Amino acid sequence: MDGILPLYKERGMTSNDAVIKCRKIFKTRKIGHSGTLDPEVDGVLPICVGKATKVVNYLMDSGKVYKGEITLGFATTTEDLEGEVISKVKLSEPFSDEKINEILSSFIGDIIQVPPIYSAIKVNGKKLYEYARAGEKVDIPERRVHIEYFKQIFPSKFDKEKGQQTIYFEVGCGKGTYVRTLAVDVGKKLGVPAVMSDLTRLKSGGFQIGMAKSLSQLEKLAHENKLSESLYPIDYAVKDLPRYDLKLEQWRIVKNGGFLSVNTFKEDYDRVNLFYDDRIRCIYQYNKEKNRYQSERMIDLS
């Protein structure tokens, strides 16, 4: 069984937990996810099954959409509600939604982030959270990420008794963006400590949350021998690339890892999906130096 499963990952489990459960349901070890969701975050997690594992990197490179909450008034070690409170202030009055929207909009475009110390990013072969738990200091490398949009989806709420304000947001962002860090940086621009207090992934790899299946739904489909109904075709991961259907003689060349001339296609492509017998077989890319097309990823040679 080959294809892509948009899984609805519930809160309380790691992304690897989800993979392990899917392996049991699909009865195969050839399964992998396309981008970690923290345990306390729910939402769509694309899972690649069988030959679809060969396109997992394309899914990881795609944009993502989240909705969530930012709470102004305190900050934690983990930048979410899982960590210890490290700073706290009581807001005497709320920020206007006009001001909040102005701040959110200032993040649109390419920005520089310093990822949270409690993250799985590796520095010198060691994960950052391992440094944090050991109490060791480490220089966290900056990274450039892209924010497509960042907006409020509901009016903010002010808790006068606690002196805290909650912002309800939606963000479209590129690969590698830490939404926790976005929340903290919003607070910095407003001059107060902040934390990401809730998060749901709405979209990943082109899959909307409404397309996702829960583990209980998968178990039901497995019991009914209908698991294949949960899978999208492998080419869904690269659906934005142009498609070219190979002739038999071309397929024989491609199957053996051969090159294709620039005259093969009517248009100039940087990358192209190659199909044979109505199945995606591989992705070819243009080699400018050699003026030819060559394999970028072989997917299905059967």
From Swiss-Prot:
Catalytic machinery residues: D38 (nucleophile)
UniProt xrefs under PANTHER family: PSEUDOURIDYLATE SYNTHASE TRUB1, TRNA-PSEUDOURIDINE SYNTHASE
Name used for this protein in its record: tRNA pseudouridine synthase B
Catalytic activity line of the entry: uridine(55) in tRNA = pseudouridine(55) in tRNA
Record-level GO BP terms: mRNA pseudouridine synthesis; tRNA pseudouridine synthesis
Protein species of origin: Ligilactobacillus salivarius (strain UCC118)
This enzyme's EC code(s): 5.4.99.25
Domain of life: Bacteria
Key words, A-Z: Isomerase, tRNA processing
Known function: Responsible for synthesis of pseudouridine from uracil-55 in the psi GC loop of transfer RNAs.
Homology family: Belongs to the pseudouridine synthase TruB family. Type 1 subfamily.
Principal EC category: isomerase
SUPFAM superfamilies referenced in this protein's UniProt entry, alphabetically: Pseudouridine synthase
